[in-house]
Regions:
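Conserved catalytic cysteine-centered active-site region
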Residues: 1-19, 26-58, 96-122, 157, ...
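Metallocofactor- and cofactor-centric catalytic cores in central/energy metabolism, strongly enriched
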Residues: 5, 75, 87-91, 99-101, ...
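Stable alpha-helical structural segments in soluble proteins, enriched in small hydrophobic residues
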Residues: 3, 7, 11, 129, ...
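Short glycine/threonine-rich loop-to-helix capping motif typified by GTGT followed
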Residues: 161-166, 198-206
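Active-site-proximal alpha-helical scaffold in enzymes
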Residues: 1-25, 57-90, 130-136
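Beta-strand segments within the central parallel beta-sheet cores of soluble alpha/beta enzyme folds
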Residues: 19-24, 75-82, 144-153, 188-197
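Phosphate/pyrophosphate-binding loops at sites that engage ATP/ADP/AMP, CoA/4′-phosphopantetheine
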Residues: 67-71, 176-190
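Condensing-enzyme catalytic core mediating Claisen C-C bond formation in acyl metabolism
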Residues: 45, 78-79, 110-179, 183
Length: 206
């Protein structure tokens, strides 16, 4: 998403009239232990990873805090997992095409309370590349598939769980969304499709 925003800004500023942005992730070839260690490097190496914390355990802390403040939302988390698997089932190129039920999620292999295996995203390989172009060029190249960018936002927050003001909201997401709404002149009620980062089902609920 940051590459997308930087590409958009580069075109809007007139520095470039066309850019290609991309992202690549290759993790499925390695062991679970190595991948877990690699992902955990995004957390605090001393006060979180140093005491054995992993991303599933850190997000489990977030989930339990959410339960404490707003009540148990395991049902909503399970529904999110079922929905995501149903979407994947419709895609012949999906990594895991398997329909599951709410009971499957709740009774799945435990990972970090309250998560079962179905609450956690898969370790995956993937890549995406997008061509961004100035409006006049995009219209000439492929007018039927050109998508206009109305708004964009970007914000940051601490990656540490202990450094956040609240564990039950994604502050950077809220700020970035507000920026995008303001820039586009649109509101949440006018959005028909949203793609969410769902590393764990609790993030989708939040």
């Amino acid at each position: 998403s940051l590459a997308f925003r930087q590409g958009m800004i580069a075109i809007a500023s007139g520095i470039y009239d066309m850019v290609i942005i991309g992202g690549v992730e290759k993790m499925a070839h390695d062991s679970t232990e190595r991948v877990t260690e690699g992902i955990a490097s995004a957390a605090d190496s001393l006060l979180e990873v140093g005491i054995g914390a992993t991303f599933p355990s850190l997000f489990a802390l977030i989930a339990n805090r959410y339960f404490h403040e707003y009540g148990d939302v395991r049902e909503a988390m399970a529904v999110a997992a079922v929905q995501n698997h149903a979407n994947a089932y419709l895609n012949p190129d999906a990594q895991l095409r398997k329909l599951i039920t709410v009971d499957d999620v709740k009774n799945g292999l435990p990972v970090a309370d309250p998560f079962t295996v179905y609450d956690c995203s898969l370790v995956s390989d993937g890549a995406v590349f997008i061509v961004l172009a100035a409006s006049d060029i995009a219209e000439k190249l492929n007018p039927k598939r050109a998508v206009k960018i109305l708004g964009s936002g970007h914000a940051g927050d601490t990656l540490t769980t202990y450094g956040k003001k609240s564990l039950t909201t994604l502050a950077a997401t809220v700020k970035a969304a507000d920026q995008a709404y303001k820039m586009s002149g649109k509101s949440a009620k006018e959005i028909d499709l949203v793609e969410l980062h769902d590393c764990f089902t609790i993030t989708q609920v939040i």
